[in-house]
Every structure is written in structure tokens, then in C-alpha cells.
Amino acid sequence: MIYDTSTDVVVSAVAALYHMAESSHTMQLSVNFKQANHLVQVMHQCSEWGQTYIMETLLFFTPQTGQEAHMLADALSRHVQVHSPTLALTASKVAMFLMNYISDMERMNALGRWIGYVLMPHMKAPPEILYTILTNVLLYIQRRPMVLRLELSHFFCTYNDPEYIKLVKLDILYQLATQSNATDVLDELQSCVTDINENIARKATHMIGRLALKWSLVADPCVAALKTIMQGRADYALQESVMVVKDILRKYPDRYGYIVTMLCDHIPSLYESPAKVSMIWILGHFCDRVEGSTDALHDYTLSFLDESSDVQLALLTATVKLFLRKPKSGGPIVQKILHQATDLVANPDVRDRGYFYMRLLTMDANMATAVVFADAAPEEALDLIQQHVLDQLILHGASLVPLLQQNQPVMMQKVRHRFMPDSPALEPSARPHASTHMHAEPSQYHTMHDTDDEAVY
């Protein structure tokens, strides 16, 4: 019936096959190249819903060669009508799927440009639709960072953007940042720091710090921007700045010592536990360079029993570092903290850490120094999602799955998992998690909840 002369019959047959394949746990729909190519050829004669069903069904076609994937992608780009966001999102999802089977970089870049051409006209869509588009774009950029080089200006925040739009735009700007455009991204982030919305300002401040970690070329202007933020009157921006400065100092320990002195002036203004943890880490790790670090850590010990467990753990490590660097002045402080941690604190993690440090300090000072002053370089891939998770999310694109990925166990109860089908043309990086069919679980089953695999770089 898919070869019928009536497009209504073709679409009805395709829709029936698609719904049966999605609802049945025994049926595995398979489309060959001849069938897929025919469906693409008649797509321009179909309604919007008909085109959507056809493109969803194309995901059941597994290219056996890169040439098949390229030919189908080329036909798709010529016959699909992308005047609506639904068609644009579905077409871009199919293009991202086919890209896994194309090894020619020039063809991949051309397909990436086409995806941008398809999606960018809808950047002025209503906020709810725009959020859906932006969420999918963020997944695409993370999966193919070297292919999807989209224009930054499309993702600059405007005054009337809702909060949820601005937040995802900031994520996209960070992912799009390169050495050549990092300065432009920093300028946009700085303008967002002054936003009246606290969540936007915090997010922008956090992204400035991440940008400094991502590209050392703009680390100096990023730190200068953070310095300006800390001199402002927004307490919440100060809390966030301290947290990102800690990570910057971990990566560039010898470059920005001057900013630690400024941080010390703001210690009384730090009231959030993560900010306190960051400040305590800085005081302990750079105790031999920071004037007044001993007094500052002593002040924190006065409220040790009233602090959260995170702050207590950070203070334990910081006082041990102080003792190893300055045994005379740090001795009384570390003895007091270890006593409180092991005898007065109810939290088992804090007690265990206290006993660990007591035993470590009695064994060998050199060993203790090697342990507590171990390489503290920050994790730079925290913003990335593993490749197999990205593939699963993208295969579910143009649906609620990418939007609700933080609540996967609930949303996936009535949605079949999708996996990358294996073939000789599939790129090697996707093969470890590939399956025999899009709905067939791989031999080594990895879901969107797994976090033990390598990230996409």
C-alpha cells in the first residue's frame, strides 16, 4: 500500500505501520532503502501530518552504506517542507540519525548546515514552541559540536524572553563557544549577569566560570568579569562567583592569586553552604599564600558544629592542609576540629573523615601532604552528556522525552526505548551501544540513567 498512487492511502498505511511498531513489543518494523527513498519522493505531496509520519517511519531504515545515508539525506533535504516547527524538528532528527552512518566530513558539514537552515527560521516562534526547538538544538550541538556551527546571534537573550528560554539559551551559547567567538559569548554572559531574575544572573555567572575553564584564551577577561560581579551589590551573584572562582583557581593555581585577597574581604557575606565550601577550600589550599588564612579558618571553626555536613567536611580538609603548611599556627586549630568531628558530630561521613585524618597525620607527614594536596584539576566535562544517552534522546526528538529528561523513569513508562541500529556504516563511537533494531535492547543495555560511561567530547 505504500506504493499506492494515492498519497492518502500511502500516509494511512505508513501511520498504521508506525503506530503498530510503537505500541507492539513483538513487532519490529524494518524499512529498506527502496521503500525509504519512495516515501521521501512522495512526501512533498502529503499534508503536514503525513510528512511527519513518513519521517518518523524513516527511523526504521538502517543504512548499510554511507552512500545510502547520504542519498536519503539529500532526497529529504529536497522534498521536505519545513514551514512548520513540527516538520523542522522531525526533519532535523532524521538528519541527525542519518549522520551516524556518514563518514565523509564534507557531507556531514553540509547536512549540519541544512539542519541550521531548517531550524533557524523558527527562532521567533512562541516561547513554548521555541523552548522545544532550543532543547533539541542543545542536544544536537552536544552530539555534533564540530558539525553544527550555528550563528551565535540567534541565541542571544532578549528582554522579553521567559526565564526558561534564557536558561537554555545560555547553555547553547556555552556549547557554541570557540576560541574565535568566546569574547562575543562572554559579552552576552556579562549582560545577562545584570538580569533582574536571580536564576538568570546565577546561570550567567556560572557560565562565565565554565567559559574560563573551557578556553584559557579568555580566562583573563572572564576573571576580570567575575571580579566586577563580586564588587556589585547582588549577594546571590557573589555566592555564585566564589564557587566558580574556586574551579578557576584549581585549573590555574598560579595565575589569579590576587583575586583570593578580594574573596577574603567578602567572607562575612557568604551564607550559602556551597559558597562557604568553596571559600574554605581556597583558604586551605592556598593557606601559605593568603595573608590571614589562619584567622579566617579559625573563625569558621567557631561555628563548626552548626554548619552543614558539606561545610564540616571542607573545614576538616582545610584545617589539615593548614597544619601541614603551618604546623605551629595550625596545630591547635586542627586538634580542635578533629576532636569535634570524631566526638561531637553525629554525621557518620564527618566522623569517618575525622578518624581518617587523625590516622593519616600520625603515620607520615609526607604521605598526608601527598594525599590532601593531590592534583585538584576540575572536571571540565561536567556539562556533557554521554554519547549513547544523547543518541537515545535525539532518536526521541520532537517529543516530550528531550524536554523531560530530568524525570526519565516516569516519562519512559509508556515510551519504548530507542537505540542506534547497527550496520557496517555505523560510526565506530556509536557501535558499543548499538542494537539489531531501533527497539531492540543492545546486548549491553545502557539507558538514559547510566552515568558510568565516557562523555562526548
Where are these regions (language model features)?
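Short inter-helical turns and helix N-cap capping residues of alpha-solenoid HEAT/ARM repeat scaffolds
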Residues: 5-7, 46-47, 83-84, 125-127, ...
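HEAT/HEAT-like alpha-solenoid repeats
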Residues: 1-2, 28-42, 67-80, 105-123, ...
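Acidic, serine/threonine-rich low-complexity intrinsically disordered linkers/hinges in large eukaryotic
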Residues: 71, 176, 271, 292-312, ...
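Extended acidic, low-complexity intrinsically disordered regions
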Residues: 51, 84-88, 92, 105, ...
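Long alpha-helical HEAT/HEAT-like repeat alpha-solenoid scaffolds in very large eukaryotic proteins
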Residues: 7-14, 26-60, 127-130, 157-177, ...
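Hydrophobic residues within the alpha-helices of tandem HEAT/HEAT-like
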Residues: 2, 16-24, 54-63, 80, ...
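Solenoidal tandem-repeat scaffolds enriched in leucines and small polar residues
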Residues: 1-110
